[in-house]
Each structure stands twice: as structure tokens, then as C-alpha cells.
Design a protein with these regions (language model features):
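Bacterial N-terminal signal peptides that target proteins for export
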Residues: 2-11
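C-terminal motif of bacterial Sec signal peptides marking the signal peptidase cleavage site
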Residues: 19-22
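C-terminal/domain-edge helix-coil "capping" segments
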Residues: 24-56, 166, 177-182, 191-235
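N-terminal segment of the mature soluble domain
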Residues: 63-136
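Soluble non-cytosolic domains of exported or imported proteins
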Residues: 97-109, 161-162, 204-215
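Extracytoplasmic/secreted envelope proteins and their assembly/folding machinery
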Residues: 107, 111-115, 141, 211-218, ...
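Surface-exposed short loop/turn segments
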Residues: 116, 120-180, 192-201
Length: 235
């Protein structure tokens, strides 16, 4: 494999693992041989990716790509029926139903933040169509869950939360012309308060936690792309 160290570092970052500077951790490796664990579409498991799950082609290589094309794969929400409209419903706790208005606001926020971060990528040109040197970055959110009840009943009750919800981000790298998948990562994270402490739930604090989570994912992606391109150019 060409530029193996750089490639595996990119997979690790794209899999949204933590960059552990100064810590002794095993490097990520793509399983190979007859005993390699394969995904449903033939990708090889990446060991030590420091993410929930990551796979890649055994010949994974991004040489030749100079542009990136982000493509949304949609958002799927957890099937929660509790709308928290009564005291009894509230006593059951979350997850809570996410209405169309909240879904629209969430999806708009995700799109804005990822677009903002990808526009900062220095080593790849951002495009909106396939091409011979275009890498498709396909991302989708699954099982989006909300632990936030609707507005307080009677406007009096206070709600304190340490986590307002969570979601799973699935990221795929594909060749834009053929659709061939090169790598996939799956990462589930919670939108939590700093330090996991309880704080009063309101629209301002809840929005802040959601933005922090989305920004975390988007920034890791941007840094991974720029870091890989820089290392490839120096080799």
C-alpha cells in the first residue's frame, strides 16, 4: 500500500477517533488475509481506529484526487412516540418525539456547519459534481435521538440534563465517477454538556450542545483531509 502511515492516519481521523498526542496507542491497521473481517460490501475492518467501527479497501489510496464533493445521505430519526405533553409522559423520560420543525432546524444546522468547515479545506477544491479527480464524501446521520422534552408544562417546571441527545454519523469515501466505496466509518456520540454536568435545559443551551457536536465531526473531517494531503505531498 502506498503512503500507508498517512492513509491510516486519515482513516483514523475520518473515523472520528481522538488524536492522542504523546499516548502509547497501537496504530490503526487494515485487516488482511483470509481471516480479515469484511463488511457486507467487501471492505476490510480497520483495527485500532479508536472509533466505533471503520472499514477500508485493502488497497485504499487517495492519490489522484484533488477535489472533494460532499453529498448528503439524509437523516433518520429514532422512532420515539413520547411527546411529553402530560406530566405522566414526562415521568417516563426520553427519548422524545422530534417534530417536523425541530427536524428541519437540525438538518439545516448540520448542513451549514459542515459546509462552513469544508470551505476551509486548503488542500482540496470543493466542488458540487463528479469528475475524474473528485472524491465523494457521503455523510448521513442515523438514529438521531432527543432527550429534550417540549416546552415546560404550564411554563413552570424546570428540566436539567447532562445530555440532550445523540446521533450516529456514517461517513463514506467514494470515487465520484464509479461510486466505488473506498472507506466507511461509523461513530455515535452524544451532545453533552461540558464535563457531563447537569445544566438547565433551554433553547440556547440545547442549541449550543448540538452545534458543538456537529462542529466536532466537521472539524475532524476538515483537519483529516488537509493533513493527509500535506503528508502525501511531502512523500
Amino acid at each position: 500500500m502506498k503512503n500507508t502511515d498517512s492513509v491510516l492516519r486519515l482513516i483514523t481521523v475520518l473515523a472520528f477517533g481522538f488524536v492522542l498526542v504523546g499516548c502509547e496507542t497501537a496504530p490503526p491497521t487494515i485487516q488482511s488475509g483470509p481471516d480479515a473481517e469484511l463488511s457486507f460490501d467487501g471492505l476490510h475492518m480497520v483495527d485500532n481506529s479508536q472509533a466505533d467501527v471503520a472499514w477500508a479497501r485493502p488497497d485504499f489510496n487517495l492519490d489522484g484526487y484533488t477535489k472533494i464533493w460532499p453529498v448528503g445521505a439524509g437523516v433518520e430519526y429514532r422512532q420515539a412516540k413520547n411527546k411529553g405533553r402530560t406530566t405522566m409522559d414526562r415521568s417516563k423520560g426520553g427519548p422524545y418525539f422530534i417534530d417536523d420543525k425541530a427536524r428541519g432546524q437540525f438538518e439545516e444546522l448540520v448542513g451549514e456547519i459542515f459546509k462552513e468547515e469544508l470551505q476551509k479545506v486548503e488542500k482540496y477544491e470543493l466542488v458540487d459534481a463528479p469528475g475524474p479527480d473528485v472524491l465523494m464524501i457521503r455523510g448521513g446521520l442515523l438514529n438521531v435521538t432527543s432527550m429534550v422534552p417540549p416546552d415546560p408544562i404550564g411554563g413552570r417546571s424546570a428540566v436539567f440534563l447532562s445530555s440532550i441527545g445523540d446521533a450516529t454519523l456514517v461517513l463514506e469515501l467514494r470515487d465520484s465517477e464509479t461510486g466505488t466505496i473506498l472507506a466507511r466509518s461509523v461513530d455515535r456520540r452524544a451532545a453533552e454538556t461540558i464535563g457531563g454536568t447537569f445544566q438547565r435545559s433551554n433553547s440556547v443551551t440545547n442549541s449550543s450542545e448540538v452545534k458543538r457536536l456537529i462542529r466536532y465531526w466537521a472539524t475532524r473531517l476538515r483537519e483529516g483531509l488537509d493533513g493527509f494531503a500535506q503528508e502525501t505531498a511531502s512523500n
